[in-house]
Amino acid sequence: MPIARRAALAAAFAVFVLAPFARAQIAPPRTVEELKAETQARADRNAYPLIGIKPADARAALAEIKTLDRDEWAAAWSRVAARYETDAKAAEAAGRIDEAKAGYLMAWRLYSFARWPTPNSPGKQTAYAQALEAFAHYARLLDPAPTLVRIPFEGKEIVGWLRLPKGGHAGAPAPLVLTISALDSRKEDNVERSEAFIRRGIATFSLDMPGTGQAPFKGDIGSERMFSRALDYVATRPEIDAKRVVVQGVSWSGYWSAKLAIVERERLRGAVVQGGPIHYYFQPEWQTKALGTREYLFDLFPARASVYGVATLDEFLAYGPRMSLKAQALIDNPSAPMLLVNGEHDSQVPIADLDLMLHAGSAKEAWVNPAGAHTGRSADWPDGKIFAKVVAPWIARQLGLGE
């Protein structure tokens, strides 16, 4: 990394460190009209978190929203989702399977956005349950269809979707990508995007990260043990080559990917850490700045706080520092190969975390978009292009499949 950029980063974090802790506050949210306009704009350009949602459907839902009430938001998007779900059931009953599959997929996306970014109201909790139901209908129509796996674990269970490529058998087991959902995405999103891996003969096992979805517990030191247990399970499946496994984490889940690369390095061929927090992200000085970013659509603090299971800003700021890989004395340890990805202008996770990880421990590879925001995305490098041109080829190489 150029010395000038390092110096700039150091200076920036010096400013954060000197910022008075007493001034910690959350920036005011968008007004309802601002939120509606920004939501529609993102739908129009197929941008996160509305990727795959039709602009016309966004307009229909937003037309019914008059306030920032979470249940009103959930109900408006759910009504649009329900129309797709009803049509999909009718199409399936009539034997129009492709039409049904497309309808269930749209219902899943819309119900899931109804609960976005976290199901923190009764209406959003209902929307999440409906999203899971719609996705289950979609999943059973996929070819090959994924299997919902439930692994007993510490009196609870780890719930994940395992999708195996066609033609796999014990004599030629498939390599696997362990995909971990992020702060506001869910494991089902990764199943939806698994086709690129399946076509290459790569299996996927998709899990929610701690503190989200159906994960068995909140995010804390040691929560990575759920993924270690998942790797144990993978090793019992004859269809999977447990010696060829890569873990993929995007945004918050990049943290778990990085940690697994260290603590499970003997069992991993590699780890993708795309926009993942490492150390600086967890410091109060960064959070008091980043919680006000307009890069995030809305409700960033409730989403982040729910990962830890805390309610107040003070609790949240006090909880975070212990999660740092530097504070846990892990960052300098040997690791499995890592691909670090992010954008220079990420306002959600500091680019300094990528720099810190890159220059610690084992040798790593990095891809940084100089014009990129969170996870590296920009107009020239949307999410899909980063995956297709950067992440997927790297994973294939680590699994011995070339590009």
What are these regions (language model features)?
Residues 372-385:
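Catalytic histidine-centered segment of alpha/beta-hydrolase-like enzymes
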Residues 347-353:
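Conserved alpha/beta-hydrolase "acid-adjacent" motif
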Residues 171-182:
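Short beta-strand element of the alpha/beta-hydrolase
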Residues 334-335, 340-342:
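Short beta-strand/loop motif that positions the catalytic acidic residue
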